[in-house]
C-alpha cells in the first residue's frame, strides 16, 4: 500500500497530516504497509468477486439511509481510492474483471470501502469524500461501464452539518449494519461465482472483450502457471479475510468514543488581530463538537460577526475576529457521542501596546482616499478620465524650480468623490520631501520641484484612479548641470548614499558626473557635517578616484550628512546634493532603535542582576577578510570572538609586508570599536597581510588568523566601452539610441549618452543620471540637424572609454510617430506594478455568479451533460463546488450591464482582484501502471489574491492524435501536485492545469509534453519538484525544493545542485556541491551581478543520481533597489530579536518566519510580532537549540524575502551584547586625557556621552581617592558631560595612575590614564616650559623669533615679530656681537621688525642677534648664518637670482655670435653651465663663457653651421638647476650669421681705412720769422693718399711751404719763414679705398713784443706825410 501524494500534502481538506501529533499514526501506517504486501496482490480478486453483492448492498442501503451512507463513505474515500488503484497491479484477475470493477467504483463501491474497516479507520484520520450509490431500481446492464460519476456532495452538507440529533444517527448506523448483514452471504456467493464463471458474464461490453483476449492467449507457459498458482493463494487469503470481515459487522465494534486527532493549541496575539482554533475529532457515530469560553457555551447568534464556527471534512474551527482584551480566556472544545464525552483546552492571550497606538485612529478608522469607497452609482459606475494641458518632456537646470502638471477631466463628475492621484519616477512612487511636493487642487495635479537636482532626472508618470478605473500619462524630465563657479571645473556628483554604517565609520558611495569640465576628473573630495550644525569638514586630504570611500573618525551615536565634490586640473566643482542623515551606530543598535517594543505591555517586569565575571582576556576574532580594496584604502571585516567576558571589547589592527614577519600596529592611539576597519596610506602595488587582536580591561588577546595576501590596488576594473551604437528616428526633436552593453562589466551603474552636431566637434550630454539597459531616447535635438552619438559606461571604478561614434542621423519624425515611453531603459515595467494603459482606461466588473467566476473564464472546459443519455461517454462532469459562497453582484446592475454588452463592447477595466495567470512547467513526478503524479509551477501572477486551488485536465494521445479533454479532479487541489488515477497503462497523455482564486478560474496552462503512463521501476530516484528561488541578491540566492515523489529502490540520501548561465549550452552545467547535501535548500554564493542563471536539482540514493528537476529560473543575479535585509537587534533590556521591514506589502501580504526554511509556527522558543509593514521575531531564551538560518518571506509579493544566520559565534556575540545591555555602562565621547594650560597648569579631562543630574564622579590617584583642595580643583559639567581636574604644578610625587570613576544611576563607567616614566617626565618638562614661556611673555618678547627671507630683488631680509612693546622699548641689532643698528623710534606695523641686507654674499655670514629691552625686562632672538645655515640661505639667494634671469637672447658681434642673459646680480656661488644639443660645451679660444656685471654670456667666435642647434644655460643654486633655452638654428642662425658677416666686414674696413695716427697738434703758435716743421704719422692699407688744406682750400707745396709724404706712413709740413700771412686753419687729408680722415690744426703767428713797441713808437708815415 502507498499513501497517495495528494493526501500526503493536501491542504484543502486534509490539514491533519501536517500536524506533529500524527507522526505516530504515519509510522503505524508504514508498518502496516510492509505487512500487507501479500494482501495487496490478493485483494483484487476479492474485490472482483464481490461486485454483485456490493451492488445489491448499495441498492438496499440507498433506499434505507442514503445520507448516512454518504457520510460514512466519505471518511474512507481517500484511502479507498488509493487502495483500489494499488490492488489492481498484481494479477491477471484484476484485468479480467476490470469492467465490473470500474462499474462498481463509478457508483462509489470500491473494495477498500467495505474491506478491512479497521485499516481505513486508523490509517486515514482525514474526512473522506462520499461516493454516490446505485439507485434501487437501476439494472446492472443498463449502466455504461466507462462512465465515472462525479464525486461531490451538496452545499448544505458542508454548511449546516449532517445530523441534528444523536438518536437519528444511531438509527442510521443500525440500518446500515442490518443491510450489511443481510447481504453478506449473497456477497460471498457472488464472489465465488465471479471467480469461476467470469468468461460467461455479459454485464458489459468491456468484460466480454476481456474474456475474448484471454481465449486468444489460452496457451499456457511457465509464467502463466506461476501466476495462476499465485492467484489461487490469493483467493484463499481473500476468503480468510472475508470471514474476519463478517466478524466485525456488529455494532459493538463500529461504535467508539470520541478521540482528538488534532487538539486546539493556545495562542498569544495582539489586539485587533484574528485568531483561529483548530481541532479534528474521530469517533463513531460522528461526535458533535461544542465550543466553550470559560466554561460558557459560545453563542454565535448573540455576537454576530464576532465568532465563526465551521466544521468541514472533520476539521472543526473557531475563529475570533478582531480580538480585544476581553477575549483573553480559556477555550474548550467538547466532543460527545453515545460512547462518551472528551474535551480539549486551549488558552488565548490578547496583548496590547502601552501608549503605542492612537485609540482615536482605532475608533474612527484610517482615512483612505474617497475613491476607494462605493460611489453613489455603485461599483458599476464608469468613469472616463482624460488629461488636458499635459506636461511634455521637460528640461531644467540644477538649483532651479520646476513644476509638472496637467488638468484632469473626469466624467461623470461626482461631488465629494475625489480621485486618487499618484506620481511615479522611474517606476517608483514619489514621496513628498523637501525637494519635491505633489499637489491636487480639485481639477489639476501638479508636482513641484523646489530645488532641482540631477537625482530628479527620470521618467515621471501620473496615475489617476477613480473608483475602479484609472488612466496614466508619462514624460521624461532632464536636469542639466548648474554653471560652475570656476570655468572648466567638473560637474557635481550625484546619488550620495551611505552603504555601511557602523560605530566609528561609514562607507559613502556616489555616482560620477557626466560632465568633467573639459579635463579628466582627478578624484573626489568627501565632506561631512554633523546634523544640527552648519560646519562642513573635508574627510580626505587627497582626492579619491574610486566612487566609494570609508569615512572614519566619527563620533558614535551622532548623525551626519555627506556631500561629494569632483576636482580636475582646473579646480573643484560644485558639491553634490547632501545625503540622507545617517547615524554612526552599530547596525544591531540601529535596528533596535528603529524597531518596536520587543514585547507588549504586561503590567509587570521583573529584573534580576547577576555578578559579571571579570578578568577574561578576549579570544581572537574570526572570519577576518578583506571586504573591499582600492588603491586608496583597504577595508577589513571580521567577527567578534566567542570568548570575550562580559564587557565590551575593542580591536587593534596589524599589518605586515609580504615576505617579512615584522607586524606593525596600525591604530596605535585609538582602538577600533566596530568589527570593521579602513586602512589608508598603503603603498599601491605592494602586498600586505593583516590580522586583528581583541582587547579589554583584562589585556590584549591573541591575534586572529592572517588574511590572504592582498595587493593594494583597485579590484574593480573600469568597464569596457559599449559597442554598436545605432541611432534611429523618433520625433522631430528626439532620436532613439541603442547600443551593445559593455562586456564583463561588474557593478555597472549605468550609461551616459552624448550627442554632437556633425562637424561641430562639441559634445553635449543627453542624460545626467546614468541609465541602465541598452536603449535611450535623446530629447532636445534640433529638427533637420544631423547628429552623431557616443556612449560610455560607468561603475564605481570610473567611466569607461567612449564608444565609437555612431553613424550620422538626421533628426526628423519616424513613420508612425516614434516609440512610446515604454521603451525607456529600465522603465518598460509600468511604474509600481501599474497596468499598462496604452489601451485606454482600465477596469473590470466583478463576475455576476459563481458559475461565471469558476467556469466562464475557461474556454477549454467541456460543457456538462444535459441529460442522462449523455453518460455514454467517459467524461467527468464540469460541475465544481470549490467556491462555497457565490460572489455577490448588485442585482440592479444586471440590466445596465446587459444593455451595454448589446450596444457596445465594454471597455477594459481593472478589477482589484483578477484571476491568476496560467501555471507552467508541468512535469511527471511519479508514474504507476494506471496513475501518474503531476507537478507544476505556480502562476507568476496571482491576480492580487491567494490561489485557492488548481484544476487538472488530461487527454489521451493515440498515434500523435490527441483526444478530448477530461477533468481529472472535481474538487480543487491546493498543492502544486496531483495524482491522476484510472489511466491506461502504456498510453501517452497530455495535461493542462488552471489556477483559481476568489475572482475565478484563470486561463489554462500550455499543453504539456506527452507523458507515458507506465510503472517506474528504475533504481535511482525521480526528479525533485517545486524548486523555488528566493532571496535573490547580486551575488547570491537561496534555492529550495521538495523531495522526489518516487524515491527509487532505496531512500534518498542527498541532493546535488547544478547551475549554468541562462544563455549557456546544455553541456556547460556545473555542480555547486561536491558531496550530496541532506538539506532541501542551498544558499548559492559567488554569482556574477547582472548575469542570468538557471538551476536544477538531482536526488541521489544508493543506486545513483536520479533525473534532474525542472529548471528553476532564469533569474538575474541582482539586488533590487530598496531591498532590505533581516537585522538583529538587542534592546536596552537585553532582549534579542530579528527584525524585517517590507514597504511593498499588499493588504493580503503576511510575514512568514522560518528556521532552516521550515515554518516556525507556534514555536515555544520564539515570539513573533507583526505591525504594519514591520515584523519582529523575539528569542525568549537564545541558546544552542536556536542555532540556524532564520528567514522571513512576505506573501503576495514578488518574492521578497531575507534571512539571517545565527551560528555559535553570532549567538555568543548576541548573548554578550545582551549582557552588556542588561548591565549598561556610561558611554564616553573621549577617554581620560591630559593637557598643559598656558601658565603651566595641568588639566585632566574626559567627556561622557550624557550625564544626568545625579551623576557622581570619584577621582582616584594610585588607587586612592583624592578630593578638592589647594592642590586639586575638580569640576563637572553635566550638560556637556565634561569632567575636569586641575593641578597648578606637577611634582615628582605626582607620577602615577589617574582614574575617573562615574556612577550615573544603574550605569557605571571609568577611564584611566597612566603617567609614569618617560611619558611623565616629558609632560613635566612641557609644563615647566609653558610656565617659563608665560613669565617671558609678561615683558617685551618675541612672538616669532628671528628668521630670514629672500626678497624678489634677491636681497636678504631678516625679520622677527615682537609683542608687548612700548615706545620706551629698545630694539638693537647685533652681528657677531657688534652693534649694527638701533631702532628706538619703531613705528612698524603688526609688530614686524626687519633688517635688509642687499647683494648678500659670503662677507655677510655670521651670527645675528636682536635684543628687546625696557624697564619690564628683555628678550633676545639669535639667528645663526654660518656653515649649513649660511649655505641654505645662499642656496635660496642663488635660487632667487636664477629665477630672476631673463630669457636667452642672441647678439651678433664682429668676432662672432654672443648668447646672453641678465640677472639682478651675480654671485660666484651660482654655477653656470652651458650645453649644446644636450651636450656640455667645452670652452676653447673660439667658444668662451663669462660674466660681465649682471650679464652672463657665451661667445662663439667665427661661427660655422656646426654651431647650429639648441643652447641651454643652466643656473645651479646648489640644489636645483634652472634652465634657460634658445634655439640657434634656422632663420635665427641665418640672421645672426649675416649680421656677424656685416659687422666683420665693417671691422675690417675700420681697421684698414686711411687715418691719421698722430703728430699734429691742435694749435701751433709760432713767432713770425721762425720755421715751422710738423711731422704726422698716417696709416692705411693700401697706403693712403695725402693732401693738405688751408682754410678748407687745397694747399700745394712750394718753396715757402714744403709738403712731403714719405714711405706711405709719414707726412711732413714745413714753412721756412713764418709770417702772419701763414696764420690760418690747416688740414691733413688722408684717403684710401676704405675711407678718408681729416686732421685739422691751427697755425697762429705772433710778432715779438719788442718789435711791437718799436712799431708803436715810430710815427705813422701817413700822418707825417699828411702834415
Swiss-Prot record:
InterPro entries in the record: FN3_dom (IPR003961), FN3_sf (IPR036116), Ig-like_dom (IPR007110), Ig-like_dom_sf (IPR036179), Ig-like_fold (IPR013783), Ig_I-set (IPR013098), Ig_sub (IPR003599), Ig_sub2 (IPR003598)
Chain ranges of the Ig-like C2-type domain: 258-349, 376-478, 1114-1212, 1340-1426, 1555-1644
Sequence segments annotated as region (Disordered): 192-217, 818-915
UniProtKB keywords: Cytoplasm, Immunoglobulin domain, Muscle protein, Phosphoprotein, Repeat, Thick filament
Biological process, per Gene Ontology: extraocular skeletal muscle development; muscle contraction; positive regulation of gene expression; positive regulation of protein secretion; protein kinase A signaling
Record-level GO cellular component terms: cytoskeleton; M band; myosin filament; sarcomere
Pfam family, one: I-set
Record PTM Phosphoserine, positions in chain: 124, 142, 863, 867, 1036
Annotated signal peptide: none
Record's function text: May link the intermediate filament cytoskeleton to the M-disk of the myofibrils in striated muscle. May also contact myosin filaments. Also binds beta-integrins.
Known partners and oligomeric status: Homodimer. Interacts with TTN/titin and PNKD.
UniProt-recorded name of the protein: Myomesin-1
Organism name: Mus musculus (Mouse)
